[in-house]
Amino acid sequence: MVDTDKFDILLTQEEHLYAIFRRDVFWTDREHDTITWEDIKKCPLSLSGGSVRMIMQSSLTDMEQLNAVAITTTKSSAIEWASSGRTVSLVPMDAKELINHRKMARIKLPEFSGDFKKAFITLKGHALSPVAQQFIDFYKAYV
């Protein structure tokens, strides 16, 4: 458990779970507006650490029901698996994040919407460097 008394929260941003996949490999027989959780469970998956936490905190599924081919430490690694056409990637993202890979689709999984947030934090009493403050200011303007 994290000792929250030691940290200042600078910014929080809501995140949702998204399925990322190659349109020319998965679900080629239909439009890509929605995907069901049952569809996802039938596919080989690449999961980021964040998506594993989101899935484990939900009551929708047991991790053993999923065909997880790769569990990665970063979103970008999970997305790379999907861009190769080998897996459907499940990653937490905010609404404004984009996928800049050709032939890729990104669909929000509404079953996993809600109480998931990412946070920018610092140790209490520690000032940000000018570069870090510039990044936070840029990010706040972006969201």
Regions found by a protein language model. Name each.
Residues 10, 18-20, 26, 88, ...:
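Residues embedded in well-ordered beta-strands
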Residues 27-29, 33-37, 41-64, 128-132, ...:
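Secondary-structure junction motif
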Residues 50-107:
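Hydrophobic hinge/microswitch elements
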Residues 1, 23, 51-52, 92-95, ...:
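Short secondary-structure boundary segments
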Residues 10, 38, 79-80:
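Alpha-helical segments flanking ligand/cofactor-binding loops in enzyme cores
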Residues 15, 42-43, 84-85, 102, ...:
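Structured helix-beta-strand junction loops
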